[in-house]
């Protein structure tokens, strides 16, 4: 193993063991119909059909790798003296020291495993075949010798769908961005978002399969101090609950407060977080209902693995050189498939602006 990771050929993965890689490392999810990429610290650029004209998350590839990019998750635990200790199992943006870190780069999925502050967090990120919803399947396990009270806060920052306009029209774009709330029974909530001129055509949606005790949709409020707070330490996360602000303009985000509750020593709690786009909230509900069930999520993940197993099985070689085998059997066909689907249109270098 080198200082950054190793190949796990038996499961067709590359395992990153140090998130501070010399360059950002991305993995493609889904397809051009709905998809994008996730980097080695959980930042994601997601779009539907055209990253120039229907981009969903705000991810600037030129930004320093230590900063927030598009999506993240926070965990928080109460301090004895009051307030909360806040950290991200993705390492970025809190840059919290870790006892273990793995980003397992698979075929159409990434699995993150981190251990810090007495908690082990596993996050599987993928898009089911043929679907327009991104799944983050989260499991938090208490490794400490006493019970811990844990909150989970997933966050996404939206961009204007016209990706170039987001960068060059600072006057008009913020006036168009709006967030909406659809409250369900038993505390379940769907936060949706769209520029007002598109809201009757489609909505981005963000939700979870656990009750949402509070939410935030205004970036300035989330960061705190009139926006002078930071993604590394958002001011609102020192409060018991988020503000329940519905942004009618400005920089739209979606953040959900999920109280995992007290986790006894050695036990786990799980959550499923969903990000997608549909023709209105009603159009999103069938996908939300299906993929809020962990049984259906596991079934969709197995279908994704079966798809890649069938694709790779068409041609396999066995030579005296395991590196050559790895390239021909796994990574070259994967690269060809990704290039065919994305046409070198969206990456860290091809920015997908049209």
Show which residues each predicted segment covers.
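Anionic coordination/interaction segments
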Residues: 1-354
């Amino acid at each position: 193993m080198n200082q950054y990771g190793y190949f796990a050929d038996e499961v067709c993965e590359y395992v990153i063991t140090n998130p501070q890689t010399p360059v950002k490392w991305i993995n493609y999810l889904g397809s051009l119909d709905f998809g994008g990429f996730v980097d080695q610290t959980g930042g994601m650029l997601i779009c539907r059909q055209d990253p120039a004209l229907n981009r969903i998350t705000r991810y600037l590839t030129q930004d320093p790798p230590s900063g927030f990019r598009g999506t993240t998750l926070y965990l928080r635990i109460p301090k004895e003296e009051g307030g909360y200790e806040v950290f991200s199992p993705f390492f970025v943006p809190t840059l919290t020291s870790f006892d273990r870190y793995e980003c397992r780069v698979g075929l159409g999925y990434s699995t993150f495993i981190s251990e810090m502050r007495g908690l082990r967090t596993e996050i599987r990120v993928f898009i089911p075949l043929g679907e327009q919803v991104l799944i983050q399947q989260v499991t938090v396990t208490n490794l400490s010798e006493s019970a811990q009270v844990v909150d989970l806060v997933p966050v996404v920052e939206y961009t204007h769908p016209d990706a170039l306009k987001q960068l060059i029209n600072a006057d008009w774009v913020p006036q168009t961005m709006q967030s909406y709330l659809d409250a369900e029974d038993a505390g379940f909530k769907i936060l949706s978002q769209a520029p007002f001129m598109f809201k009757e055509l489609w909505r981005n949606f963000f939700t979870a399969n656990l009750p949402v005790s509070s939410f935030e949709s205004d970036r300035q409020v989330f960061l705190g101090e009139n926006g002078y707070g930071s993604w590394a330490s958002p001011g609102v996360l020192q409060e018991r609950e988020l503000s329940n602000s519905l942004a009618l303009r400005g920089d739209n985000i979606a953040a959900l407060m999920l109280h995992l509750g007290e986790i006894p020593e050695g036990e786990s709690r799980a959550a499923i977080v969903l990000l997608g786009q549909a023709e209105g909230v009603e159009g999103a509900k069938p996908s939300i209902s299906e993929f809020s069930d962990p049984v259906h999520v596991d079934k969709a993940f197995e279908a994704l693995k079966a798809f890649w197993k069938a694709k790779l099985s068409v041609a396999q070689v066995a030579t005296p050189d395991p590196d050559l085998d790895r390239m021909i059997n796994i990574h070259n066909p994967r690269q060809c498939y990704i290039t065919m689907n994305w046409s070198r249109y969206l990456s860290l270098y091809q920015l997908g602006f049209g």
